[in-house]
Amino acid sequence: MKGTGIPVQEKENGAPDTVQENGGPDIRTEERLAYFIRMLSDDNDTNRWKAAELLGRMRDPDAVDPLIDTLWDDDSRVRLKAAWALGQIGDIRAIGPLRRLYRMENEDSQEIITEAIEVINLRTGQQ
């Protein structure tokens, strides 16, 4: 039986705009996830940044690998938003790549990366 969807945002660039009211799996949520993962490869850096932001807010572990790939984006804003998103998801798989990125970034960027690592450690009970 298909659940009733509730609007979460106006459609933009064809993105699905509903989620299941009962919080269960919903094809629309899966479509949104796939859409935002595709947007991580968009030519427009602002679209990539927004996609990373939204994936972080969704907190879906299926976004971890694509976000890890995004840590090497040419645009530093996109890289840092991907680092933030990985912290929000809280998956231990992101720790190694975040540490590698840390060594490549400036001091200001390192603060954001450190915060993401700390959030992951808190969420997973790591030290």
Regions found by a protein language model. Name each.
Residues 3-6, 26-39, 60-72, 91-103, ...:
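Amphipathic alpha-helical scaffolding segments comprising HEAT/armadillo-like alpha-solenoid repeats
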Residues 51, 82, 113-117:
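Conserved hydrophobic register position within alpha-solenoid helical repeats
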Residues 4, 11-13, 22:
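Asparagine/serine/threonine-enriched low-complexity, disordered tracts
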Residues 43-44, 74-75, 105-106:
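Short inter-helical turns and helix N-cap capping residues of alpha-solenoid HEAT/ARM repeat scaffolds
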